[in-house]
């Protein structure tokens, strides 16, 4: 949020009372602020970069560059981080190599978020001195590269022992903001730090969460918001006044049709393959995203990742789907979060899957709380549909048999451990472990005179 520039007085585009903060309208509110204990993109999107910072950050090209570490030296699998001087946490405590070491160990030993696996290659952490940290990573060049990249994401969030007891209510980091108020399902209010090491932070911040895109757009129209981030209804673009600027970027978001690999009928790979051939992904893109999404060929990899396969694994082929079902008419329930994209896509899935022989029931659940508890944590579902927007999340999704997909393939785990992500993706797609319907676009709307956010989502932060 600190990057948002306001060339005009706030509320200049409407009749709202003048404000001295930056207001971002978003969807998908976090159920809590502690992203160390559970998956989900909303909490890190709000906190990483705003409250928490990382030793390296990921630039617009997808490369890790120095951040809290002003310099990174690499000798094979040994990384030496030289930390910036003058960086402090919001409580005034200086940021040191001890804090960096603590943060890495905390991921390894205390996190329950599946992304903690990104820290598995670390075999040694040494505090050389107050401003120098040395980390040893094993697994070969690919694994080492992947680890360094992950250190620019939520996994690399730098914390302090004094802050971990209040991760859910008062997160403490080195970033430009502190959390002033968290209203579950409604908003996160931020205070700008006057002592931020990176320079002046001009305005306080507020992220407001809206259940529907029309309400978010209306807030922008009347001056109650400055930016709509990740607008979920592309069809509204043509209705906007000319002075509202629209940018469309790419994301890490795989709109994933998940199939519980441990529960019938999806414990049969041929049934999963039948689903993959039965779904017309191009139709989903047109109806849900006005054609603005990117088709990944069904693979759970955005085009910006180095191992993007760039081919169609499951072309739309209803006859092939019927052949794989071999006369069976499986009864399935798709548990659908109450998000606009998911609701619209599920209606298409309903008709497409019924056309090849599935008996389909749609079950709508509240997102995030109910979906997280029932599907992600409870694994109480047959099929579901959600946008997974965590960056480079193939290991989390498909490398852990205890994850909600229930996908268990030792070959895939070996390839992930060896850094052979392309090979892992090939096997995942051969098994039809899940189907990516689209790589979701990021639609950003700006009020007049507002700019500064990059619409291309490279990591997990806003």
Question: Could you say what each language-model-derived stretch is?
Answer:
Residues 14, 359-370, 396-448, 454, ...:
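Extracytoplasmic/peripheral linker and loop segments enriched in polar/acidic and small residues
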Residues 24-25, 92, 351-402, 421:
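Periplasmic binding protein-like
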Residues 26-76, 105, 172-173:
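N-terminal lobe/hinge region of extracytoplasmic solute-binding protein
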Residues 73, 78-80, 117-159, 180-181:
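Surface-exposed binding/hinge segments that line
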Residues 149-200:
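Gly/Pro-rich hinge or "lid" segments in bacterial periplasmic/extracellular proteins
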Residues 193-238, 359:
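Ligand-site clamp/hinge motif
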Residues 262-304, 344-345, 424-433:
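Periplasmic-binding protein-like
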Residues 290-324, 339-344:
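Structural transition elements
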């Amino acid at each position: 949020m600190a990057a948002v520039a306001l060339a005009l007085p706030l509320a200049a585009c409407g009749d709202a009372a003048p404000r001295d903060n930056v207001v971002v309208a978003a969807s998908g509110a976090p159920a809590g602020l502690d992203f160390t204990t559970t998956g989900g993109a909303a909490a890190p999107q709000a906190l990483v970069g705003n409250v928490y910072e990382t030793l390296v950050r990921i630039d617009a090209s997808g490369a890790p560059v120095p951040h809290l570490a002003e310099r990174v030296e690499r000798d094979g699998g040994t990384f030496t981080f030289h930390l910036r001087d003058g960086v402090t946490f919001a409580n005034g405590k200086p940021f040191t190599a001890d804090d960096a070491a603590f943060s890495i160990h905390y991921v390894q030993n205390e996190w329950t978020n599946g992304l903690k696996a990104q820290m598995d290659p670390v075999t040694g952490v040494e505090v050389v001195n107050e401003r120098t940290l040395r980390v040893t990573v094993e697994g070969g060049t690919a694994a080492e590269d992947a680890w360094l990249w992950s250190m620019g994401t939520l996994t690399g969030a730098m914390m302090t022992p004094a802050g971990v007891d209040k991760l859910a209510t008062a997160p403490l980091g080195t970033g430009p903001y502190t959390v002033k108020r968290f209203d579950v399902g409604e908003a996160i209010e931020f205070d700008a730090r006057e002592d931020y090491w990176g320079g002046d932070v001009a305005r306080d911040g507020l992220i407001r969460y809206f259940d529907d895109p029309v309400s978010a757009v209306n807030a922008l129209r009347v001056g109650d918001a400055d930016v709509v981030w990740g607008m979920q209804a592309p069809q509204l673009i043509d209705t906007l006044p000319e002075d509202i600027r629209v940018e469309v970027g790419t994301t890490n978001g795989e709109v994933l049709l998940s199939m519980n690999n441990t529960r019938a009928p999806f414990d049969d790979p041929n049934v999963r393959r039948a689903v993959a051939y039965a779904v017309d992904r191009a139709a989903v893109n047109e109806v849900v995203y006005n054609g603005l999404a990117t088709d990944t060929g069904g693979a759970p990899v955005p085009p910006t990742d180095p191992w993007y396969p760039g081919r169609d694994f499951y072309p739309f082929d209803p006859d092939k789907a019927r052949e794989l079902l071999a006369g069976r008419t499986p009864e399935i329930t798709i548990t659908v979060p109450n998000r606009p994209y998911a609701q619209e896509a599920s209606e298409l899935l309903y008709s497409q899957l019924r056309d090849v022989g599935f008996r389909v029931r749609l079950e709508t659940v509240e997102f995030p709380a109910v979906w997280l508890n029932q599907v992600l944590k409870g694994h109480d579902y047959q099929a579901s549909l959600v946008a997974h927007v965590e960056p480079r999340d193939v290991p989390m999704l498909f490398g852990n048999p205890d994850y909600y997909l229930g996908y268990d393939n030792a070959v895939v785990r070996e390839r992930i451990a060896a850094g052979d992500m392309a090979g892992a993706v090939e096997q995942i797609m051969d098994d039809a472990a899940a189907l990516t319907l689209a790589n979701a676009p990021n639609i950003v709307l700006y009020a007049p005179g507002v700019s500064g956010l990059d619409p291309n989502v490279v990591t997990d932060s806003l």
